Amino acid sequence: MNIDNDLLSKNKEAKVVSENSTVEINDVTNSDSKNTDNDFQTEELNNFEKIFLNLNSDLLNQQLLVKNNLKLYKIRAEKEINRAYKFSLKSFISSLFPVIDSMEYALNLFKKDDKILCLIFNELDNVSQSLMNLLVKFGVTSIKDINIAFNPDIHQAITTQVSKDIKNNYVISIMQKGYLLYDRLLRPAMVIVSKNDI
């Protein structure tokens, strides 16, 4: 029986040692597993942080883009409003040109030696000047200069005239004034252009 007890005792010791080894192995395995889990979690956190930073950067870039687009839109809208304001009177002003032309033509026909006609002339001249001052107030300028180079953007040549005194391709005479509304041509000036004798 002693042998059996010894065997039994050794068996129990082996079992205890075996259990302790298993516990130690399990502890080491659990420790390694916990370290692996911690490393994995840290890596995941780092990945999430990178993703978050990228998304944040993208959102900031989009915010700047939207701000810039709004600024550009505001600038364009202001330009359109200014342009619409400047040129809103274009058709009205253009319809006044025949009246102005008729008044100027009538003023050129007057003989200045008759007193009554002279009074009428002065009144018509005042009306004409008042009308032109009003147009200038709204940004209209007349094209009436002579002895300047012919410019097809603002002049329309009716005919040419041979001249030795004036340079070739210069405006000799204005037959009908032209008009600009700010920088936009409303009507070209009808002109006679010089031509050198060849």
Swiss-Prot record:
InterPro entries in UniProt: GrpE (IPR000740), GrpE_coiled_coil (IPR013805), GrpE_head (IPR009012)
Localization: Cytoplasm
GO molecular function: adenyl-nucleotide exchange factor activity; protein homodimerization activity; protein-folding chaperone binding; unfolded protein binding
One cellular component term from this protein's GO annotations in UniProt: cytosol
Main location: cytoplasm
Keyword check for Chaperone: yes
Gene Ontology BP terms: protein folding
Keyword Chaperone: yes
Keywords: Chaperone, Cytoplasm, Stress response
Subunit structure: Homodimer.
Functional summary from the UniProt entry: Participates actively in the response to hyperosmotic and heat shock by preventing the aggregation of stress-denatured proteins, in association with DnaK and GrpE. It is the nucleotide exchange factor for DnaK and may function as a thermosensor. Unfolded proteins bind initially to DnaJ; upon interaction with the DnaJ-bound protein, DnaK hydrolyzes its bound ATP, resulting in the formation of a stable complex. GrpE releases ADP from DnaK; ATP binding to DnaK triggers the release of the substrate protein, thus completing the reaction cycle.
Family note: Belongs to the GrpE family.
HAMAP family registered for this protein in UniProt: GrpE
UniProt-recorded name of the protein: Protein GrpE 1
Provenance organism: Buchnera aphidicola subsp. Baizongia pistaciae (strain Bp)
Name of the gene: grpE1
